[in-house]
Regions:
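Transmembrane alpha-helices and adjacent helix-loop boundaries
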Residues: 1-287
Length: 287
């Protein structure tokens, strides 16, 4: 509880950072250089934040390592692309169904967490990522294999979300809602159970916490959020392929969480903003 108060007192400025990120495109539009690339980067930041706050819930708050979150993202992305463009499901329905599908896979992957931990669990989740990648390639009739899949623009209440600005506000609206939702989870009984498991499984079990239930729940929620990020990535980028979801991306996500500070929702946000901007804006300038 002391740690929670410490986070609240020292991270109050992070919402201001989020506000600045949202307002930046308006400043960019008035400049002489093309702002579309920068808007694309900010869209990427928003999508990744949805995933990393979920990963932080799993790794930072529950203490379970995952090196396969790119796979959950791929499941959400491909599920939505297939459901919307091939099955005919409305985008708003897919926005709910596809993340749940990813969450169910997360639930299944969570079973090893009942028996193994640490890097053994990390390697297990990484292996899951390889399996999903091969499965996507094998399901060529639905996924077009390694060639990639063209994805339609999202349609909400009869309005097609097209263009950089529309995509931007869709992504960031969802991202902010996810941040608020995860903060509420962290401060709830569920969040306290997650942190108790992270701090000491033996003590948590002795206090009456069902370890299996909460570990599986953590994997499920984290998988749902990764799948949600995948849905938005697919329908705003309009193209997905297996190259977008390789194992290095999962490690990339872990780095974001660690840089911002594992076990803090806003830390995951800050780490994501920092790493994506560093990778896309500053590193290319040094090459």
């Amino acid at each position: 509880m002391i740690k929670g108060r410490y986070e609240d007192e020292n991270l109050k400025w992070i919402p201001l950072l989020i506000g600045l990120v949202i307002l930046i495109p308006f400043a960019l539009k008035g400049m002489t250089f093309s702002y579309k690339y920068y808007l694309y980067i900010l869209n990427t930041v928003g999508v990744y934040i949805i995933l990393t706050v979920g990963l932080d819930l799993l790794s930072g708050y529950t203490g379970l390592i995952s090196l396969g979150h790119a796979a959950f993202m791929a499941i959400g992305a491909y599920s939505s692309a297939i459901l919307v463009d091939q099955v005919g499901l409305p985008f708003m329905a897919s926005l709910i169904v596809s993340p749940i599908i990813a969450g169910l896979f997360g639930f299944l992957v969570g079973f090893p967490a009942l028996r193994v931990s640490g890097m053994y669990l990390g390697l297990t989740t990484m292996g899951f990522g390889f399996i999903i990648r091969r499965l996507i390639i094998a399901m060529r009739e639905w996924t077009q294999g390694s060639g990639g899949l063209v994805v339609s623009a999202p349609e909400i209440f009869g309005f097609t979300i097209k263009g950089d600005w529309a995509n931007y506000f869709l992504v960031w609206t969802v991202a902010l809602l996810v941040i608020v939702a995860v903060r509420r989870i962290v401060k709830s009984k569920i969040g306290r159970a997650f942190m108790a498991i992270r701090d000491s499984e033996q003590a948590a079990e002795a206090s009456g916490i069902n370890l299996a239930k909460y570990k599986m729940l953590s994997f499920f929620i984290s998988g749902v959020l990764a799948g949600l990020a995948g849905v938005l990535m697919a329908h705003t980028n309009h193209f997905i392929s297996t190259d977008h979801f390789d194992s290095m991306l999962s490690i990339y996500f872990i780095i974001m969480v660690l840089v911002g500070g594992a076990g803090t929702v806003y830390g995951a946000v800050l780490g994501t903003v920092f790493i994506v901007l560093l990778d896309n804006l500053f590193v290319p300038e040094l090459e």
